Amino acid sequence: KAWRGRLAQLEGIARFTHIEVLQASERLVLVFRVLKKLTDKDRASLLIWATELDIDIYIRPDDEQPITAINETISPLTHTVLGHDLTIHPDYFVQVNAAVNQLMVAKAQEWLAPDAGSRVWDLFAGHGNFSVPLAQNSIVDAVEVSDEMVAAIEFHSKQLCRDAATSTGKLIAHKKNLSDRDSLNS
């Protein structure tokens, strides 16, 4: 929380609409949404913070442009879900409360109770928060509309295959337009 006290030092504080805070398994990440381009002084200040506080800082200009890292060296981020390390990006939707997330995923597994013969569909699967743990023992069809999320699920599927000694399931990524009924039949 040391970063909070430094906000007043920024000359362009009015340029920020909000700050997203992401606590990944191993790092703290701040994503600053900005209305206008950062001043060179503020950019330099944020870079110093990132180094001194050992955090990752990203800038999100608007919804049309991708977020960019202030730091030159950004480590991959992960969050752990029921023993599975899932690689994430600050743009991904992640449940902010890790304990609540663990409970939600465990409850989904309890309700569905998938076994080796089960096939589960995870609609709007995101990066695989529910899909990967469910695929430990069953076949999971993870359906997404976003190319980036499909790629994330495919990446996690490959990880699951490498862990085949502890997994009897399978994770399959599908890109579908979920508002198109015909898309679901293909």
Regions found by a protein language model. Give the residues of each.
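Extended interfacial segments that mediate partner engagement and assembly in macromolecular machines
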Residues: 1-16, 23-27
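Short glycine-rich, acidic/polar surface loops and turns
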Residues: 17-18, 74
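Well-ordered beta-strand positions
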Residues: 20-22, 80
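Short amphipathic alpha-helical segments
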Residues: 28-30, 138
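Accessory substrate-recognition/RNA-binding modules or partner subunits associated with SAM-dependent
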Residues: 30-31, 61
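Short beta-strand-to-loop capping motifs
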Residues: 32-36
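Rossmann-like S-adenosyl-L-methionine
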Residues: 37-186
